[in-house]
Amino acid sequence: MADEINRASPRTQSALLQAMQEQHITVAGARHDLPKPFHVLATQNPLEQEGTYPLPEAQLDRFLMEIDVDYPDRDAERRILFETTGADETLAKASMNAEILIAAQRLVRRLPVGDSVVEAILSLVRAARPDADGGDKLIAWGPGPRASQSLMLAVRARALLDGRLAPSIDDVLDLAEPVLKHRMALTFAARADGRTIPDVIRQLKTRIG
């Protein structure tokens, strides 16, 4: 768990990128393999820019999704009040062990995906690149093949969590924004026109919706 990852120095970010990419780290010339499963969950504060280091594109691409955490609703905030200010000590409870998680990951990869869903993934990701067919010069740089891989895994996992035997195009549309938005940047003209990445993704989704 990397808290406020954009406050880490570029050298630290580079070391993390090696771990995410190669599943091992190197210390004093010695290689140390990381345990399996290995996951990186990271947070960053989008409101404070002073003292931060923007993550490079290569590192952003290593994250499966980017999820914005909004303010909690009233009921959730009420639970937070009572659960964090009482005298009872709250302890984290394990929901699964490593073996179960690895088995679940394997099951996700075995879930069948229909041709229509595959084509929707390819069409959406390829449309999010600069100078894509029908593009209107909004995108400065866009998602690579890893975005297609991530979207394929994400829709499979969502279907499995919902108790379905295969993902649907609705899964592709619902997960497009969190999978793609950190893998894209807009042109200066698009930003000057007030466009945002979520706006552009919503526009791209209409082509396959």
Write out the residue ranges for each language-model feature:
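Walker B beta-strand of ABC/ABC-like P-loop ATPase nucleotide-binding domains
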Residues: 1-2
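Conserved AAA+ ATPase small/helical "lid" subdomain
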Residues: 91-148
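Canonical AAA+ ATPase core
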Residues: 7-8, 12-15, 20-98, 102-111, ...
